[in-house]
Amino acid sequence: MAPKGSQRVVNKIVAENRKARFNYEIIDTYEAGLVLTGTEVKSLREGKANIAESYASDEGDEIWLINSHLPEYLQANRFNHEPRRRRKLLLNKREINRLRAGINRDGMTLVPLKVYFNEKGRAKLELALAKGKKLHDKRETEKERDWNRQKSRLLKGNSQ
């Protein structure tokens, strides 16, 4: 229990997959719990996780996070965890069925967006059902961003 007067950081983002929003069109997002060992939680709290090349896969009645990197906890001894092991995601049966139906559609995939600690101190993963963008879609998004930036500069310049 935290001592009185101390403030817990709410929704502290530990790792973020920034490229996912550029490479994929996000259709729907879900919040999933992570099954972690003690040393993995300690390593996460240090903020050294990497989910840039990771993805989620549906196997049987479960969803697994694959290829995420949680480095070993330095203060741990022989009971340390494997950095790139598969981690089970905790979702409701209804959510798993919805995700499975989404994956079975053409071009859909499960992409992790960010790992964070919620207000109860639990490690959570924001998971997105997404569709891969084509090269011309990425260029169009980039042009739109540039135009919005220019527009805001022009409006800012006119208001002075």
UniProtKB/Swiss-Prot annotation:
**Keyword Plastid annotated:** no
The GO biological-process annotations, alphabetized, read as:
trans-translation
GO annotations of cellular component type = cytosol
Q: Which UniProt keywords apply?
A: Cytoplasm, RNA-binding
The listed locations are:
Cytoplasm
Q: Which Pfam families match?
A: SmpB (PF01668)
Enumerate the GO terms in the molecular function aspect.
RNA binding
Q: Where is the composition biased (Basic and acidic residues)?
A: 137-149
Where is it predominantly found?
cytoplasm
Matching InterPro entries, A to Z? SmpB, SsrA-bd_prot, SsrA-bd_prot_CS
State the HAMAP family in the record: SmpB
Keyword RNA-binding set for record:
yes
> What family, per the record?
Belongs to the SmpB family.
Q: What is this protein called?
A: SsrA-binding protein
What CDD domains does the annotation carry?
A: SmpB
Q: From which domain of life does this come?
A: Bacteria
Q: Region Disordered: what ranges? A: 133-160
Recorded name of the encoding gene: smpB
- What PANTHER family does UniProt report for this protein, alphabetically? SSRA-BINDING PROTEIN, TMRNA-BINDING COMPONENT OF TRANS-TRANSLATION TAGGING COMPLEX
Q: What does this protein do?
A: Required for rescue of stalled ribosomes mediated by trans-translation. Binds to transfer-messenger RNA (tmRNA), required for stable association of tmRNA with ribosomes. tmRNA and SmpB together mimic tRNA shape, replacing the anticodon stem-loop with SmpB. tmRNA is encoded by the ssrA gene; the 2 termini fold to resemble tRNA(Ala) and it encodes a 'tag peptide', a short internal open reading frame. During trans-translation Ala-aminoacylated tmRNA acts like a tRNA, entering the A-site of stalled ribosomes, displacing the stalled mRNA.
